[in-house]
Design a protein with these regions (language model features):
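Intrinsically disordered, low-complexity Ser/Thr/Pro/Gly-rich regulatory segments
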Residues: 1-56, 61-324
């Protein structure tokens, strides 16, 4: 590996680190460290003595999962490649690398000392450093064709490309914009009907992987409105970060989901659409008008407003310089 490749790789690891920190994740230990392989025959790591510790960990993070009601640890592998260097075989190679690392990490005593036990989750962040050439449909084909062997103790790997990573950056930038004008902004986790009461409604400062890959991300906040020197009132504002195609059918489906956890119980609901959605403005405006007319007719004080997330072409430069 050339010095330039090493520099760009380290820079992307730093950017990945800051993206996840800005999403509220907690880092464990250092970046770019090795752990021993405990399954050398299966992982074929004993064939060369060039590297004593064959499994490298770019980043190790953890967060509390409201749906599972427990802390989980995630091994993050960050890859930085030109588009020509991203193929079905390279993505398969990256995936296998993460799987083998997790198999050995789950029983590693040093990681247990960091509070990371029974690690069974990974995040593979593959960034194409030629964003103008990146083909998301082709990348999705590569992911669909991955060969994943059945394991007695399952491992879950989330694979993110430019498409997902830039969406996360858009959320981060919008939340930074919102927080100075709002109080108590937190991401919202509805109760999970399928968990037999294990999961109750929750509000957290962080996003979990399930939400990060979801077409809808929910949040709640308050706005303090000062009426005069001595009097103020509080306005409840709910948020939906909307990444699906905003047709009337999709919007109606999304709202049918929110009814189950009373997300319309607020003074204002802001839907943050991803991009300007010019070609679907008719659908959006029609849906919002119908909803607001119904709320007014029913005597509800809720109003729906529209906002738009910027679609970024690259990861913001300041993400490579420490937490932004």
């Amino acid at each position: 590996m050339s010095e330039e490749q090493q520099y760009q790789g380290d820079r992307w690891t730093s950017q990945s680190q800051n993206i996840l920190k800005n999403l509220g994740w907690n880092q464990n230990g250092d970046s770019n460290f090795d752990i021993p392989c405990t399954n050398k025959s299966a992982h074929r790591t004993g064939e060369s003595s060039v590297r004593k510790n064959p499994h490298g960990i770019d980043l190790l993070f953890s967060y509390f999962d409201p749906f599972l009601s427990k802390d989980i640890s995630i091994i993050v592998e960050s890859k930085h490649r030109k588009w020509a260097g991203i193929s079905k075989s390279t993505v398969q190679e990256f995936l296998d690398q993460v799987l083998m690392t997790i198999e050995c990490a789950s029983s590693n005593p040093e990681l247990k000392m960091l509070g990371c036990e029974n690690i069974r989750t990974g995040l593979l962040m593959i960034w194409c450093n030629e964003p103008e050439k990146f083909d998301n449909e082709k990348f999705k084909e590569y992911v669909k064709e991955l060969d994943i062997k059945t394991r007695r103790n399952p491992i879950t790997i989330f694979v993110a490309s430019n498409n997902e990573i830039l969406k996360w950056c858009s959320i981060i930038e919008k939340v930074k914009e919102l927080k100075p004008t709002l109080a108590d902004f937190k991401f919202f986790y509805p109760s999970d009907f399928f968990s037999n009461g294990l999961s109750t409604a929750n509000r957290k400062d962080h996003l979990t992987l399930i939400q990060m890959f979801s077409p809808y991300v929910f949040a709640k906040s308050k706005k303090i409105i000062r009426l005069n020197r001595e009097t103020q009132t509080t306005q409840d504002i709910n948020h939906i970060f909307f990444f699906a195609k905003p047709t009337i059918d999709e919007l109606n489906f999304m709202f049918s989901c929110t009814k189950k956890f009373q997300f319309e119980d607020a003074d204002k609901l802001i839907i943050h659409f991803y991009g300007q959605q010019t070609h679907l403005r008719v659908h959006i405006e029609e849906f919002i008008r119908r909803k607001n007319e119904k709320y007014e007719k029913d005597g509800s004080h809720l109003t729906i407003e529209i906002d738009y997330l910027n679609i970024l072409s690259d990861v913001p430069e300041n993400y490579s310089k420490g937490r932004s």
